[in-house]
UniProtKB/Swiss-Prot annotation:
The chain crosses the membrane at residues 33-53, 77-98, 113-133, 178-198, 226-246, 288-308, 320-340, 347-367. This is Cytochrome b. InterPro entries: Cyt_b/b6_C, Cyt_b/b6_C_sf, Cyt_b/b6_N, Cytb/b6-like_sf, Cytochrome_b, Cytochrome_b_C_euk/bac, Cytochrome_b_N_euk/bac, Di-haem_cyt_TM. The keyword Heme applies. The gene is MT-CYB. Pfam families: Cytochrom_B_C, Cytochrome_B.
């Protein structure tokens, strides 16, 4: 009798995806982040579900319902902080996952890469709307500032913003719809993640060398299941240290003040994981220009496969490209720092230089360096 694991329609899918999947024998710890993102997503859906049982999406009670969760609900505080800091872990894993893709040339699988970009946008939208829900000062003003950016769109901008708000300002209608979207989007993300995996399994995984590994594959289980479990344990450890020792480390103190439309906080800034994009937005004095630069900073990932001029897929054996890659990482860290600083000298100038450098590295320096490396190979 055939093993039910390989014959039953449901278990066959699981078997071919997570058990008997032929996997390159040399993939490193950088390949762990896909599974870690899956774990983060499950954690966020579960903690979010329990939070939604006690949360009320009304402007008069939203802030106090979050306080109620932390004070009165059994273990409500840990659920709330696991959800808030789980989002930070999610983005850390996301950035490392995308960075891995850039470094090792995983973008040469166009379908997988493009679905990944859509996933990135969807997760960013979900996180933004989630940040609005506690209805603190930074929630309210963050929502006001970011949604207002759409008014930069010619002709329809103002109408579009008021349509999203459901009125003439961020109010009850806005909060209710943001809660509805924040609830539904993670399930859309789950579906997209399944499609992401589907396309990945059409081609098989890339590996650090960037060389086809069809001649040297090993089963996913037990080799990579045990490796993923180790990654999951380290992720859980990091998250729980954050939650139990310094849960507010990555949050904003202003969000412990209830939303007040009559009082603007001195420095409006988003959560840390959006600061790099926020710095790029602020570095351009023109509103529409800033919005276009903001969108381009993420959408630029979509044209990375077109800019690949190297004869090698991975950066493993390309030292000049490696230097540029780490310069890009340093530049993004600089942008993250600048995004959290007030709009004054010298931060404005540093932000503008870092923004120019970001686009220059990706659009000009990396393709040119690859051509130089190709010529060096001829020597």
């Amino acid at each position: 009798m055939t093993n039910i694991r390989k014959s039953h329609p449901l278990t066959k899918i699981i078997n071919n995806s997570f058990i008997d999947l032929p996997t390159p024998s040399n993939i490193s710890a950088w390949w762990n982040f896909g599974s870690l993102l899956g774990i983060c997503l499950i954690l966020q859906i579960l903690t979010g579900l329990f939070l939604a049982m006690h949360y009320t999406s009304d402007t008069t009670t939203a802030f106090s319902s979050v306080t109620h969760i932390c004070r009165d609900v059994n273990y409500g505080w840990i659920i709330r902080y696991m959800h808030a800091n789980g989002a930070s872990m999610f983005f850390i894993c996301l950035f490392l996952h995308v960075g891995r893709g850039l470094y090792y040339g995983s973008y040469m699988f166009p379908e997988t890469w493009n679905i990944g970009i859509i996933l990135l946008f969807t997760v960013m939208a979900t996180a933004f709307m989630g940040y609005v829900l506690p209805w603190g000062q930074m929630s309210f003003w963050g929502a006001t500032v970011i949604t207002n950016l759409l008014s930069a769109i010619p002709y329809i901008g103002t109408n579009l913003v008021e349509w999203i708000w459901g009125g003439f300002s961020v109010d009850k209608a806005t909060l209710t719809r943001f809660f509805a979207f924040h609830f539904i989007l993670p399930f859309i993300i789950s579906a997209l993640a399944a499609v992401h995996l589907l396309f990945l399994h059409e081609t098989g995984s890339n590996n650090p060398s960037g060389i086809p590994s069809n001649s040297d594959k090993i089963p996913f289980h037990p080799y990579y299941t045990i490796k993923d479990i180790l990654g999951a344990l380290l992720l859980t450890l990091t998250l729980m240290i954050l939650v139990l020792f310094s849960p507010d480390l990555l949050g904003d103190p202003d969000n412990y003040t209830p939303a007040n439309p009559l009082n603007t906080p001195p420095h409006i800034k988003p959560e840390w994981y959006f600061l790099f994009a926020y710095a790029i937005l602020r570095s351009i004095p023109n509103k529409l220009g800033g919005v276009l630069a903001l969108i381009s900073s993420i959408l630029i990932l979509a044209i990375i496969p077109l800019l690949h001029t190297s004869k090698q897929r991975s950066m493993m054996f390309r030292p000049l490209s490696q230097c540029l890659f780490w310069l890009l990482v340093a530049d993004l860290l600089t942008l993250t720092w600048i995004g959290g600083q007030p709009v004054e000298y010298p931060y404005i100038a540093i932000g503008q230089l870092a923004s120019i450098l970001y686009f220059t590295i990706l659009l000009i320096l990396m393709p040119m360096t690859s051509i130089i490396e190709n010529n060096l190979l001829k020597w």
